[in-house]
Design a protein with these regions (language model features):
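Short beta-strand/loop motif that positions the catalytic acidic residue
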Residues: 183, 189-191, 195
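Catalytic histidine neighborhood in serine/cysteine hydrolases
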Residues: 204, 208-226
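Active-site nucleophile loop of the alpha/beta-hydrolase fold
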Residues: 115-125
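Conserved alpha/beta-hydrolase
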Residues: 41-59
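The serine-hydrolase catalytic nucleophile loop
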Residues: 27-38
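Catalytic active-site module of serine/aspartate enzymes centered on a nucleophile-bearing elbow/loop
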Residues: 221-256
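Gly/Ala-rich beta-loop-alpha elbow adjacent to hydrolase catalytic centers
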Residues: 92-96, 100
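Conserved alpha/beta-hydrolase "acid-adjacent" motif
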Residues: 196-202
Length: 256
C-alpha cells in the first residue's frame, strides 16, 4: 500500500459546516476520492475517507475480503464522523455508492443526505452470473480500473480483479437493491453518459427504488466511470458542496 492509498481525514473543528463520509469503489482506494475530499475541505466541510478492507493492496489480499467487512468499515467511519458533532453526509463512487445506500437503509437517521457517483446496484453483463463457479477455476480476471475519458489520468487499483471479491460484491447488491425503499434521505446523483464499468441504468434503478422526497440528478457528458478524476469532476465537487449547503440550511431552518 502506498501513502496515496491511505485513508484520510480533514477535521476543520468548530468551523466545519458538516462532515462528508467518502467511500471509494471496488478494487480502488481513497486516492480516487482525495480531489473530491480536498475540494469539500476547502468549501468548509470535514471529510473522512476510509480504506475498505482488502483494498490498496494486491488482488490476492482483496480476494479474501467480503462485503460485510467493507460495510463494517464504512459504518465505523460513520461513527467517527458523528463524533465530530456536525451533520453527516455520505458520498460514494460505484460500489462506494452501493455501500452508502446500504448505510442509509440501516442507519438513515444518522445521515443528512447521500451523494452518489455512478452507483452500482446490478451488473448487466451475462458473464457475471458465472462468477460463483468461475472463482474456483479462474481466481482473477483483468483489472476494471481507470475507465477515464481523460487521457493523462490513471486510477490506482489492484492489478487484477479477484473473482471471489466480485462474488461478494454481487451479494451486496442482492441485499441492498430489495431494500432501496428504506432510503428516505435526500439524494444527489451524478451519472456519466458513457460508462464502461457500471451501466448508467443503475442510477435509474436507484432513483426508482428509493423513497427520498428530494432526488437531484445530473448527467456527466464528458466523463467515464471514474468521474471523480475525469473531465466533469468539478461538477461533482461544486454540486455536492451546494447540495450539502442546502440541506444543512433546511435543517437549521426547521430547528430555528
Amino acid at each position: 500500500m502506498t501513502i496515496d492509498s491511505e485513508e484520510f481525514t480533514f477535521d476543520l473543528g468548530s468551523d466545519a459546516k458538516a462532515t462528508m463520509l467518502l467511500c471509494h469503489g471496488f478494487t480502488s482506494d481513497p486516492a480516487s476520492m482525495r480531489p473530491w475530499g480536498e475540494s469539500l475541505r476547502d468549501a468548509g466541510f470535514n471529510v473522512i475517507a476510509p480504506l475498505l478492507p482488502g483494498h490498496g493492496d494486491t488482488w490476492q489480499v482483496l480476494a479474501k475480503a467480503t462485503w460485510q467487512q467493507w460495510y463494517a468499515r464504512l459504518e465505523a467511519a460513520l461513527d467517527e464522523a458523528l463524533a465530530l458533532g456536525r451533520p453527516v453526509f455520505a458520498g460514494g463512487l460505484s460500489m462506494g455508492g452501493t455501500l452508502c445506500l446500504r448505510l442509509a437503509e440501516q442507519r438513515g437517521a444518522d445521515l443528512a443526505g447521500l451523494v452518489l457517483v455512478n452507483p452500482a446496484i446490478f451488473d448487466s453483463k451475462p458473464q457475471g452470473f458465472l462468477a460463483p463457479a468461475l472463482r474456483y477455476v479462474m481466481p482473477s480476471v483483468a483489472a476494471i480500473g481507470s475507465d477515464l475519458n481523460k487521457p493523462d489520468v490513471r486510477e490506482k487499483t489492484t492489478s487484477r480483479t479477484p473473482v471471489a471479491a466480485y462474488v461478494s460484491l454481487r451479494q451486496l447488491w442482492k441485499v441492498t437493491r430489495p431494500e432501496l425503499a428504506r432510503v428516505t434521505v435526500p439524494l444527489r446523483i451524478f451519472t456519466s453518459a458513457e460508462d464502461h464499468v457500471v451501466n448508467p441504468r443503475n442510477s435509474a434503478v436507484v432513483r426508482a427504488g428509493v423513497r427520498s422526497k428530494s432526488v437531484e440528478s445530473t448527467v456527466l457528458p464528458r466523463s467515464f466511470h471514474v468521474a471523480t478524476l475525469d473531465f466533469d469532476a468539478e461538477t461533482i465537487f461544486s454540486g455536492s458542496a451546494e447540495f450539502m449547503d442546502r440541506q444543512v440550511s433546511r435543517t437549521r431552518g426547521v430547528h430555528d
